């Protein structure tokens, strides 16, 4: 802000002053106290005294600007008051001289708003009339000016009042304010306040008390300036404006535009006081109210500034010349570090040659460089250094390739890519790192023997396969078409750890500790319903195979017609491969999937074709039957994609697909469907089907008409049964101990377990759901072998927001290998529902179970045989309780302990639930719909998914029990 100054004179003399940045200067007459005016002879004019400018918002006082003022405040405005002392006190028959002050201020204007313009306001006050006694022992007042809605105040010196009660005081006060004028809202009201110093037990304290307030509409002043005499009434009660307690006579009132050219010329002149600005000037004190000040200087001029930090930020951007000379060869250090990152074109970019010691060396050098920059640079603007981008220049905005950056959606993170583990997306990768990744990807592609080129003809286009950005796959930029490769090729081609090595040093040196989480892969921090490293299927670096495209081309023939049904088969085990082979022999519409990436690619292509059909036809499409042949974890991957994809679509899309569940192995959802549909039960839940797919090897000869049963279900499913979708929120421990925990939101329709999730028989039911796919490396969290770290910031909230079924995992620290200490807080959904044990509980309050549990299981499925949906969950807990020691009689042996007893409880009608370990350092393993998630600090369950996708449509036969 430019310098402002002013001078003014009165009848009795002249005075002047000038203000500089960061201080306010005022000259005012020093009048004797009232009790001395009648006793002392006239005195010579006293020398002018410096005043103060204070900040009302933060009560911050900075560097002294004169010898008599104890402290002055740093501010965007400059205030000057001038005047001359009267020749003497008012003797008998003499009219007291008017109180003379010229007050200047420049208030900051929000230049980012087009409707806010700076204007200059001029106000001259001639007389103060006290109509009522406003306070006892009132001997001095202050006239303050403030914009309504702002905390910045410009105050005059204290005006000493005679002790005669109701008085008239002659004034010669001039206020000149540069203020922000808003053109499009009614926020231009100027408050003229009559204030006095606060007192406590006859002692002056910091702060001011407002006695009366008057309002001036600046919009009217701008349109109709006034040079005549006006009377402004001041009211002690804003609601009662009919009776003023004081009046101020105004001589002139105007609002004028600012000369922008003059301001620009002043702004271009960098005065020396900017370079001399020092951090030592910031000595602050606090007060109770706006307008605080040192109580020893009650006669000073006060100025308040709320935006003090903004001023300091703009000033500190100008680096001190003297400070620059002290920097020890910063440029040389910087160039030397850049050379260490230079990539040699002849050798190529081989990350395998970069050791951890070299990376750590570079990190330490960069940390030392940044420390030296902060040490020798007086700038304290934190955000300038807290950048998530590279230290190189930010690239110009441009359109990204279609496949790049697609997984940045908060809900689409389960799709794997080269960028999915330990690497950053396009948005958080520097140009240097992008060049390294390009070389990695190019060498990786060259090593693939059967890789396809862009000239290969595929009827399924990229848009068909991956849909829009919210449902797209993230694959390497140069890989436009799927590659035909085995699992070993995918695992051994581009190691994620190599890619991760490129980004780790950059993250640690260019981002603060709290912000590093934002630059991590979405799989480690997302709040979505999916994960890039999904624990149930495949690896994160996989992309759809060519066979998936070929099978889709045979099913999705044209845009004019939609297929009646699509059969998705999980071929990661022999059961799925066996069923797929039988169906393919009969030329059924089968798509074999081996990973979550392929599942989502098929469903995304199907949604895209449905969208094209709706665009080309006026009639609504009939539901497409999507059969899911696999275990519970396979259905969970389909459910997560369904919930996430349809969250951004209208409710009509909920009826465009109908899912058919064909179980291979244990499946709690299929077990429930069999209880409401007898024909479904006879097809997939009989002993023949169960015995066939529970074997370890496929049968030599076909003992069962598997394809016939599947197609009978596909063709005969004419009824839709809506299964409620519940929500589970997992609070997971981060891979790095110093990082904050992160949350994951997962939809489910079946059972969640905490406890025994191995393949051993379960304590409840018939061992529902051990995952079909190996879950030794869960996708949400770091390995269980990493050190346990206590995170005090991640504690269970007061109320949960999700629901599911739980299972408890054995803890090595537990007194028993198969139990764990848990605390389960739950809320009942309906007062009428109560626990089967018959205990009375308040349904509206929290209920707590704190014990050593063998298993905890929460189910969202309705009761067996009930087709009517319920809005609550049911929890089954099995606790282990050790009885007290029983002393033995007539024997000298130690008291023996009775065997541990198990106690089972079933609690129904639960709407919300929170489960956490008794010890914060204990991490949980949770199985949700057959998918295991590790390193869970605590989790919450709610009976309903929060979006409009609240049900999962499942097709059944037209049996009597189906709805």
Curated annotation (Swiss-Prot):
One GO CC term, this protein: Golgi apparatus
Alphabetical list of Pfam families matching this protein: C2_PACS_N, Pacs-1
Subcellular location: Golgi apparatus, trans-Golgi network
Oligomer and partners: Associates with AP-1 and AP-3 but not with AP-2 complexes. Interacts with FURIN. Forms a ternary complex with FURIN and AP-1. Interacts with NPHP1; the interaction is dependent of NPHP1 phosphorylation by CK2. Interacts with PKD2 (via acidic region). Interacts with SORL1. Interacts with WDR37.
Biased composition (Low complexity): 53-72, 770-804
Keywords (A to Z) from UniProt: Acetylation, Coiled coil, Disease variant, Golgi apparatus, Host-virus interaction, Intellectual disability, Phosphoprotein
Region feature (Involved in binding to AP-1): 168-175
Pathological condition linked to this protein in its record: Schuurs-Hoeijmakers syndrome: An autosomal dominant intellectual developmental disorder characterized by intellectual disability in combination with distinct craniofacial features and genital abnormalities.
The protein, known as: Phosphofurin acidic cluster sorting protein 1
Regions annotated as coiled coil: 353-377
Compositionally biased tracts (Acidic residues): 276-293
Comp. bias regions, Basic and acidic residues: 262-273
One BP annotation, GO: lymphocyte homeostasis
SUPFAM superfamilies (alphabetical): beta-sandwich domain of Sec23/24 (SSF81995)
Compositionally biased tracts (Gly residues): 1-22
Residue numbers carrying Phosphotyrosine: 251
Function: Coat protein that is involved in the localization of trans-Golgi network (TGN) membrane proteins that contain acidic cluster sorting motifs. Controls the endosome-to-Golgi trafficking of furin and mannose-6-phosphate receptor by connecting the acidic-cluster-containing cytoplasmic domain of these molecules with the adapter-protein complex-1 (AP-1) of endosomal clathrin-coated membrane pits. Involved in HIV-1 nef-mediated removal of MHC-I from the cell surface to the TGN. Required for normal ER Ca2+ handling in lymphocytes.
Residues modified as N-acetylalanine: 2
